[in-house]
């Protein structure tokens, strides 16, 4: 397994992430996959600019929504890096399943392809995308219907991006959720990243907090 889960890369610089991508290829070919169609191309253009700032210029857009190209998707495994962008993870999950991306990502995970996932894209690789629903629903509602929102499950914990921007009341909901849903939640500040080499084990850079059964526990080892 070769996964990097981040809060906002490349919008916040992270040398460790850049180094891992460069280790995959000197001039990596990167598949940029958003949750839904980028109608005016603005998101892709901005992503290209940000990746260009760290000298990655071979960025290709893969649409899994309105302009789905199954032939293009069939060659996903040929990219050096697969990048799952930010966005609504509930919609991302729906489109990934509908387009067949979810199955292809599972294959890429099992074959050790490098996948970099940010924010909503990172949630797609966890067991469930229900953390996002806490923004608009109660803990009780989210837990009661959590079974309908299972995701790829490449890692065993759920991920909360942008924890440095969250209000205390929302963090309290996440702590309750971790207890009532019986799941670990790993919270990432902007600029942080997890480097997952197996379903349960990761190293990290930046500020990372782990919640378990409603409590804050120690995180795993820092990456070099």
What residue spans do the PLM features occupy?
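C-terminal and late-domain segments of enzyme folds
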Residues: 1-26, 38-49, 81, 131, ...
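Glycine/Thr-rich phosphate-binding loops of Rossmann-like dinucleotide-binding domains
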Residues: 13, 92-93, 126, 133
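ATP/NTP phosphate-donor binding region
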Residues: 15-75
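Glycine/threonine-rich flexible loop motifs
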Residues: 89-99
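N-terminal small/polar loop signature for handling phosphorylated ligands or for N-terminal nucleophile
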Residues: 70-81, 93
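Catalytic nucleophile loop
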Residues: 83-86, 109-128
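Catalytic-core regions built around general acid/base machinery
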Residues: 75, 99-112
């Amino acid at each position: 397994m070769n996964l990097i889960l981040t809060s906002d890369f490349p919008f916040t610089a992270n040398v460790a992430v850049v180094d891992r991508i460069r280790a995959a290829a000197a001039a990596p070919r990167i598949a940029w996959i958003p949750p839904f169609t980028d109608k005016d191309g603005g998101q892709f253009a901005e992503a290209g600019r940000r990746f260009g700032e760290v000298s990655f210029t071979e960025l290709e857009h893969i649409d899994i929504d309105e302009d789905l190209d199954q032939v293009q998707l069939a060659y996903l495994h040929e990219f050096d890096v697969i990048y799952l962008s930010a966005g609504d993870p509930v919609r991302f999950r729906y489109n990934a399943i509908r387009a067949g991306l979810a199955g292809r990502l599972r294959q890429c995970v099992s074959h050790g392809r490098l996948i970099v996932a940010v924010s909503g894209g990172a949630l797609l690789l966890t067991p469930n995308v229900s953390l996002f629903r806490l923004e608009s629903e109660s803990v009780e509602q989210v837990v009661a219907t959590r079974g309908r929102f299972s995701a790829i499950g490449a890692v065993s914990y759920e991920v909360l991006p942008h924890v440095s921007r969250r209000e205390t009341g929302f963090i309290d909901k996440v702590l309750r959720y971790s207890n009532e849903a019986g799941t670990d939640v790993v919270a990432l500040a902007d600029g942080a990243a997890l480097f997952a080499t197996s379903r349960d084990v990761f190293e990290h850079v930046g500020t990372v907090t782990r919640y378990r059964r409603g409590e804050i526990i120690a995180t795993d080892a820092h990456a070099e």
